[in-house]
Amino acid sequence: MDGTIKEALSVVSDDQSLFDSAYGAAAHLPKADMTASGSPDYGQPHKINPLPPQQEWINQPVRVNVKREYDHMNGSRESPVDCSVSKCSKLVGGGESNPMNYNSYMDEKNGPPPPNMTTNERRVIVPADPTLWTQEHVRQWLEWAIKEYSLMEIDTSFFQNMDGKELCKMNKEDFLRATTLYNTEVLLSHLSYLRESSLLAYNTTSHTDQSSRLSVKEDPSYDSVRRGAWGNNMNSGLNKSPPLGGAQTISKNTEQRPQPDPYQILGPTSSRLANPGSGQIQLWQFLLELLSDSANASCITWEGTNGEFKMTDPDEVARRWGERKSKPNMNYDKLSRALRYYYDKNIMTKVHGKRYAYKFDFHGIAQALQPHPTESSMYKYPSDISYMPSYHAHQQKVNFVPPHPSSMPVTSSSFFGAASQYWTSPTGGIYPNPNVPRHPNTHVPSHLGSYY
């Protein structure tokens, strides 16, 4: 037993790291001390495993992954799915990338990158829209799909000299000629996903750009026009400048906006006002009658929706008015003189600066059509007062003027005072006889009734 232990110790004693305390202490020193070439406490420097380079290689994929997510959030035009072969080989396989990775292709094509250029920046950028791919993009996508989904039995020569447009035109049968059914479904699904993502991104971006352009053009347009007008007043030399884009945008929007039909808006009102009822039709009502029907636009038509109209054929309008009134000698001169009568009535006005153009005042027409009281009715109310005829009638019947007036019988001498002082007229003795019947609606005040 003791011989076995001694033999084991003799074998292990060759490794001084198990017994030498100085060696163990040196193992716990910082990395900077472990790389010092002059330290005599632990063996030769070439026996130490170079840990710092390995640590840098481990941290590199993490840095690439974070930068990749940041680029995708900022609307990168790369494919929505990360097609980096070098990333997949390092993260999944954990080893060095094979000769078909994108980094080797980029190094061969453009030479070594700058020292401050990261792995993510060295990646080849593939357009998000597969229809824009070149032959090289198709080759890169195919290599990425083979390694990403572990696809086998794919004839890569079938996709040589094929760009993105030809690739998108391929159907399921075309893919089956180059690979198996499983690989065909995988490739078609990923290709369809890329196309849908690119269309959605394009529509969203175009809508956002269009709305931003509209908001930028609509808001400053008035301000730009106002500044241009102010500048023209201050400096006449600015008149030579080209027209502003904002003003052109406003004019185009105004022209493109559909104008309302005046016959639909003013038609019902014209028909209602043109109906004279049982009386004779007037000239302004006759014009409204013509304007209520768009078939008469050859001789008279509306000019907008504010009541303005124009006689396109004034002689025809005068002729029709003469037929209606049985006046064959009617012409436009007589018609225009008749229209002047309505200026003071606030029924219509003449539009200045335009020939044969007039404008109806519908508010004035509504006031003109309201019934006004006549002069006889204004003086009917005083004659209808009830106490006037009854007063004169009762004066004859009751005999308000007796031959010998007497004093008013009151209970208090301070209420009216002396009768002769208050009633100075001979009618001071009102109702001297208490047996006289009282008549309603007389001029006697109500507060005197309690004394009789």
From Swiss-Prot:
The modification Phosphoserine is found at S39. One of its GO terms (biological process) is cell differentiation. GO terms for molecular function: chromatin binding; DNA binding; DNA-binding transcription activator activity, RNA polymerase II-specific; DNA-binding transcription factor activity; DNA-binding transcription factor activity, RNA polymerase II-specific; RNA polymerase II cis-regulatory region sequence-specific DNA binding; sequence-specific double-stranded DNA binding; transcription cis-regulatory region binding. Its main location: nucleus. GO terms for cellular component: chromatin; cytosol; nuclear body; nucleoplasm; nucleus. It is linked to Ewing sarcoma: A highly malignant, metastatic, primitive small round cell tumor of bone and soft tissue that affects children and adolescents. It belongs to the Ewing sarcoma family of tumors, a group of morphologically heterogeneous neoplasms that share the same cytogenetic features. They are considered neural tumors derived from cells of the neural crest. Ewing sarcoma represents the less differentiated form of the tumors. Bleeding disorder, platelet-type, 21: A disorder characterized by increased bleeding tendency due to platelet dysfunction. Clinical features include epistaxis, hematomas, bleeding after tooth extraction, and menorrhagia. BDPLT21 patients may have mild to moderate thrombocytopenia. Can form homodimers or heterodimers with ETV6/TEL1. This is Friend leukemia integration 1 transcription factor.
